[in-house]
Curated annotation (Swiss-Prot):
This is Exosome complex component RRP45A. InterPro entries: ExoRNase_PH_dom1, ExoRNase_PH_dom2, ExoRNase_PH_dom2_sf, Exosome_comp_Rrp42_subfam, PNPase/RNase_PH_dom_sf, Ribosomal_Su5_D2-typ_SF, Rrp45. Its main location: cytoplasm. Disulfide bonds: none annotated. It holds the Pfam family RNase_PH_C. The gene is RRP45A. GO terms for molecular function: 3'-5'-RNA exonuclease activity; RNA binding. PANTHER family: EXOSOME COMPLEX COMPONENT RRP45, EXOSOME COMPLEX EXONUCLEASE RIBOSOMAL RNA PROCESSING PROTEIN. GO terms for biological process: RNA processing. Expressed in roots, leaves, stems, buds and siliques. Disruption phenotype: No visible phenotype under normal growth conditions.
């Protein structure tokens, strides 16, 4: 993604020198310290499995859907999930409409790798009929505004959407126990996904030939930095994934330093996500109670006739 930004949009020489000189004094253009994170805000839509995340000036929206498909032959009793990203030209002039570009594929791959390799989502619980039908979960990420560090914002958006997604309940019946019945939400409560832990992504930018390290780089900083690395950890301190694009090498001490910084913040970010999801679930539960109360009251009073 660095190449796309550097090729499509460049700072002037004076602007680049100003950013670098400020970083050498451990200052950043937006007033943060080198390892400070921008404000993270999470909102949810009316439907299950939709979220909108704002990280500073970066906006990302996520939608989760699911459908019944045939399982992979090598995993007959496991469901699957996939990630698709859409970069709108409205979010960044360097984004081009049409098929996903290299940067969109890379963004989806980073998030997919952390979820898949850490086994965060229980794919076995997505099996309906072994060898025949499983749930395939799809995560769509839409970049609304690129203010820098798309990976971290998209990662949180995907996790928040997964935690609030509900799939229809299914039962297997028939004479040969091969018939699948999908129950509507009015008949049976939809089921949440089983998520074992939350892999949180933290992206670091390198400046001045790797001698300066910052956390959560902005759009302007991404145009100046010489490299990046994304570290994904959970609240327990487990390493889920490390992604280092580009050809620049990174010393082992720098990697360990990034891991320590990411681990120290993972619990706080996890709490922000869980608190937002709990507030959303409480709001939906209260609305459901009000709706049922209104329906029961109308049934007691009978139909209202307007003359």
């Amino acid at each position: 993604m660095e190449g796309r930004l550097n090729n499509m949009w460049r700072l002037t020489v004076n602007e680049s020198k100003f950013v670098e000189s400020a970083l050498q004094s451990e200052l950043r253009v937006d007033g943060r310290g080198l390892y400070d994170y921008r404000k993270l805000t999470i909102k949810f839509g009316k439907e299950y499995g939709s979220s909108q995340v704002q990280l500073g000036q970066t906006h990302v929206m996520a939608f989760v859907t699911a459908q019944l498909v045939q399982p992979y032959k090598d995993r007959p009793s496991e469901g699957s999930f996939s990630i698709f990203t859409e970069f709108s030209p409205m979010a960044d002039p360097s984004f081009e409409p049409g098929h996903p570009g290299e940067s969109a594929v890379e963004l989806g791959r980073i998030i997919d790798r952390a979820l898949r390799e850490s086994r965060a989502v229980d794919t076995e619980s997505l099996c309906v009929l072994a060898g025949k039908l499983v749930w395939s979960v799809r995560i769509d990420l839409h970049i609304l505004d690129n203010g820098g560090n798309l990976v971290d914002a998209a990662n949180v958006a995907a996790l928040a959407a997964l935690m609030t997604f509900r799939r229809p309940d299914c039962t297997v019946g028939g004479d040969n126990s091969q018939d699948v019945i999908i129950h509507p939400p009015e008949e049976r409560e939809p089921l949440p996904l089983i998520i074992h832990h939350l892999p949180i992504a933290f992206t670091f930018g390198f400046f001045n030939k790797g001698s300066i390290l910052v956390m959560d780089p902005t759009y302007v900083e991404e145009a100046v930095m010489c490299g990046r690395m994304t570290v994904t950890v959970n609240a327990n301190g487990d390493i889920c994934a490390i992604q280092k694009p580009g050809e620049e090498g990174v010393n082992q001490s720098v990697i360990l330093h990034c891991l320590r910084l990411a681990s120290s913040r993972a619990s706080a970010t996890t709490k922000i996500i869980r608190d937002a999801v709990e507030a959303y679930n409480r709001e939906r539960s209260s609305q459901k109670v009000k709706r049922h109360h209104t329906l029961a009251k109308s049934e007691v009073l009978g139909p209202i006739v307007v003359v």
